A protein has these predicted regions:
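Short alpha-helical interaction motifs and adjacent low-complexity tails used for partner binding
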Residues: 2-514
Length: 514
């Protein structure tokens, strides 16, 4: 995900205001605070600034929520995703003026108008919308100009203080950034306040390493990118004590007073003691430590020195080989199968991109035939093939085989991920749905309950994903009771339910990404 860390050389402002360059290049004063119950900014050594809690937090607690400073839908999904709440829609309502923005309905369109009106005019004038980075920087600047002089008791930092890492970018990346800057000036209306090139470049650098990817309402696909300044103060750890989820908000209530904005929520994964630093993971944990360090250095320009990286915790599991009665495959065999797996994963992705799912299944089966005698159950190469095989077979409605792979995947993930990791919860949920479709009701219910126990912590009871899961949990519980009473009646009712397809399809992710 495009999400990064704040770096200001370990300094913390001593007052509640920061003198900074405004977008016109003149000195301005932006008011911020050092504390926002229950968090405060502190000097986190070589990591720069950080956030810590001022009181004890428990698993599932929302440490803080933050509406986006600005956010945009990805170019590739601009016709399918609401530009206000970021929900996917089959028949969205189009803005009649710019003909670019789409919304769930007029309620969402009205809610977004304050953000969209200047964008709408700019798009109409040039005849087309620029790329998402340009649109996001423009929205940020319009927001800055609109909010000049305002003071917020929930603003812990300013965009001016966020690190852009321009000095650390490669020549190729800087060249791309300059192209975006030029596209910005072609887009920026002459009637808007002039903006200096240095400041525009700074903002492009900021979103490059601090942009947060926004998912759809079911968490199945990244659909946009936004900037959340307070969240940028939360430093990285590969084994964090918090997770970040997107709450799409509520614009559907008849009474507008019950409407809520799209926002991120920083949630505690377990007990966090008073004074303890808040951390999240910027990258997926399912990479060996040296690969995570490389990714973090490449995207966020820092060397990770967390305990899991410095000690290589769980690297042995991620590279595990099969041990049969004390006998392990030779290093040459392991290398050969590893090389084969890397090549197979490339072929799988190519076939998947082309929508050739039967070819994906064929390659997965061939890969597993070679991997199973050599790799242990937690080996990352094996798990990646199992994940893809389960997902694609579910899409092809070959649920029994898919369920077997899904169970093996979950068994491996459970030994690797943090017990309250959101990705683990989502994987278990998908495995549960796959088992339900396969008619394995007892296993399905157990998996669904396990997923619910995780997602109630990571997402909360009112998130759309958790609500969906609660419906599935209730249904599988009812079916399990019926199954134990009379299997014949259960099978008959199950066929009736399947014909209406009330439950989320286990292979839905493929439909949304292909």
């Amino acid at each position: 995900m495009l999400w990064g860390v704040d770096r200001v050389d370990g300094k913390v402002s001593t007052g509640n205001s920061s003198s900074s360059l405004s977008c016109s290049g003149q000195q301005s004063v932006t008011m911020t605070v050092e504390k926002m119950d229950p968090v405060e900014v502190f000097a986190a050594g070589e990591k720069g600034r950080g956030l810590r809690v001022t009181k004890e937090m428990s698993a599932g607690d929302v440490v803080f929520a933050e509406a986006s400073f600005a956010a945009v839908v990805f170019d590739s999904l601009s016709l399918q995703v609401c530009h206000s709440c970021f929900r996917r829609q089959a028949n969205p309502h189009r803005c009649a003026q710019c003909k670019f923005a789409y919304y769930c309905d007029r309620t969402c369109q009205r809610a977004a108008w304050d953000e969209h009106k200047q964008e709408c005019s700019a798009i109409k004038k040039i005849g087309k919308a620029p790329n998402e980075n340009v649109r996001l920087v423009a929205r940020i600047l319009w927001r800055i100009q609109k909010d000049t002089g305002l003071v917020s008791d929930a603003q812990l930092t300013t965009l001016d203080l966020l690190e852009d890492h321009l000095s650390k970018m490669s020549p190729e990346d800087l060249k791309e950034l300059k192209v975006d800057v030029q596209h910005f000036y072609n887009y920026w209306p002459k009637k808007s306040k002039p903006v200096g090139e240095d400041y525009v470049s700074h903002l492009f650098g900021v979103i490059n390493c601090n942009g947060f990817t926004l998912s759809d309402q079911r968490g199945l696909q990244a659909v946009g990118v936004g900037l959340f300044p307070n969240l940028c103060l939360v430093n990285h750890d590969c084994w964090p004590n918090c997770t970040v989820i997107l709450n799409p908000g509520n614009q559907t209530a008849l009474d507008a007073s019950f409407h809520s904005k799209r926002r991120i929520e920083l949630r505690a994964l377990g007990k966090i003691s008073e004074g303890e630093e808040l951390t999240v993971s910027y990258v997926d944990f399912l990479n060996v430590s040296k690969d995570r360090q490389r990714l973090l250095k490449q995207q966020y320009y820092f060397d990770c020195k967390c305990e899991h990286c410095t000690s290589g915790i769980k690297d042995d599991l991620m590279t595990a080989v099969r041990d049969t009665d004390g006998h392990k495959p030779s290093a040459d065999v392991v290398k050969a199968v590893t090389d084969f797996s890397l090549q197979a994963l490339v072929k799988i992705e190519e076939a998947r991109t082309k929508g050739n799912f039967h070819e994906v299944v064929k390659i997965c089966r061939e890969s597993l035939e070679k991997q199973d005698p050599v790799f242990g159950g937690t080996n990352l190469h094996l798990l990646r093939v199992l994940s893809t095989a389960s997902e694609v077979l579910s899409f092809l409605q070959q649920f029994t085989e898919a369920a077997g792979y899904a169970q093996r995947m979950v068994d491996g993930y459970t030994k690797l991920y943090h017990p309250n990791n959101a990705q683990l919860g989502m994987a278990i949920m998908r495995a549960g749905v796959t088992h339900w479709h396969a008619g394995l009701i007892e296993a399905a219910h157990g998996l669904i309950c396990s997923a619910y126990a995780i997602l109630i912590i990571t997402h909360g009871a009112h998130h759309p994903i958790t609500k969906d899961l609660e419906v599935i949990r209730t249904q599988t519980e009812m079916e399990l009771c019926l199954f134990k009473q009379n299997e014949l009646v259960y099978r008959s009712m199950r066929e009736a339910v399947l014909s209406d397809k009330p439950m989320m399809h286990a292979g839905e992710q493929i439909k949304t990404t292909s």
